[in-house]
């Protein structure tokens, strides 16, 4: 695990990233920011996976999707993320049955800047570890699972 992974009580980093929010032509992408959940008074649940088009990741993502309503009922914004591009995310969603109807955005951290600030990049390939963060309405990290 990275040496300086952000933990409980740390401020979740500010970010503005492109995400896949739909598979509808012309409406696939949107900018998601760290302020979006705060202005709505919601908690942030952001989970990370290493790479798209792998075998384990879709199962985890599909389970988060199955539970998306539970997160919404608890005033939490759910975001999935990896260091793959928004175009790879969109292709993966189109290609995989379990990912076509996702109810949450797939964030593209192509610059790896957010993963780096969180301290969750692997040393070799520079892809994200499997990690889940929960931050409160003020952006303070309240739970981490790695």
Predicted regions and their residues:
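Chalcogenol-based redox active-site neighborhoods
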Residues: 1-146
């Amino acid at each position: 695990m990275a040496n300086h992974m952000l933990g409980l009580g740390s401020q979740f980093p500010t970010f503005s990233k492109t995400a896949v929010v739909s598979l509808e032509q012309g409406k696939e992408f949107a900018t998601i920011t760290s302020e979006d959940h705060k202005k709505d008074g919601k908690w942030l649940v952001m989970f990370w996976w290493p790479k798209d088009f792998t075998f384990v990741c879709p199962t985890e993502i599909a389970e988060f999707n199955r539970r998306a309503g539970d997160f919404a009922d608890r005033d939490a914004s759910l975001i999935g993320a990896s260091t793959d591009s928004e175009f790879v995310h969109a292709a993966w969603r189109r290609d995989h049955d379990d990912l076509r109807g996702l109810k949450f955005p797939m964030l593209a951290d192509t610059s790896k800047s957010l993963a780096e600030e969180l301290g969750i990049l692997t040393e070799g390939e520079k892809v994200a570890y499997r990690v889940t963060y929960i931050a409160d309405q003020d952006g303070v990290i309240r739970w981490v699972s790695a």
